């Protein structure tokens, strides 16, 4: 976390309500594999359950990240997704409300224990 807070190609922002941290977003910009253009990649986005105005706080966090990617870093696209599968319907609705479009799919392969 400390690395991402200090590296110029990483973004880290906390949401505070009262005297408590209630949410965060972090991500980075990276060049595409076959192009020098930049892609914004969200790595974590969370607002604590039970937080008043949770969706609004989450949207503000994500808009801050998107603005940083597109305006400050001049990325051509921002990629984000629900890879945890927590409240997926609500998360999908919030993404769409913020202007994201759904594409592709995410798969995982886990080590057997």
Which functions belong to the PLM regions below?
Residues 65, 77-91, 110-111:
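Conserved beta-strand-loop-alpha-helix junction that forms the acyl-donor binding cleft
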Residues 2-13:
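A short helix-loop-beta-strand connector motif used in the catalytic cores of GNAT acetyltransferases and
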Residues 14, 20-29:
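Conserved beta-strand in the GNAT
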Residues 60-76, 101:
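Conserved acyl-CoA
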Residues 21, 71, 83-104:
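Conserved active-site alpha-helix within GNAT-family acetyltransferase domains
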Residues 31-42, 102-103:
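A conserved beta-turn-beta hairpin within the catalytic core of GNAT-like acetyltransferases
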């Amino acid at each position: 976390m400390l690395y991402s807070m200090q590296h110029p190609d990483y973004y880290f922002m906390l949401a505070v309500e009262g005297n408590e941290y209630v949410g965060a977003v972090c991500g980075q910009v990276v060049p595409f594999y076959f192009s020098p253009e930049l892609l914004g990649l969200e790595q974590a986005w969370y607002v604590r359950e039970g937080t008043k105005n949770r969706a609004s706080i989450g949207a503000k966090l994500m808009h801050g990240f998107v603005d940083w990617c597109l305006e400050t870093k001049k990325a051509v696209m921002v990629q984000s997704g629900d890879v945890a599968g927590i409240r997926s319907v609500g998360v999908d609705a919030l993404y769409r409300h913020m202007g994201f479009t759904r594409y592709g799919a995410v798969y995982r392969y886990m080590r057997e224990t």
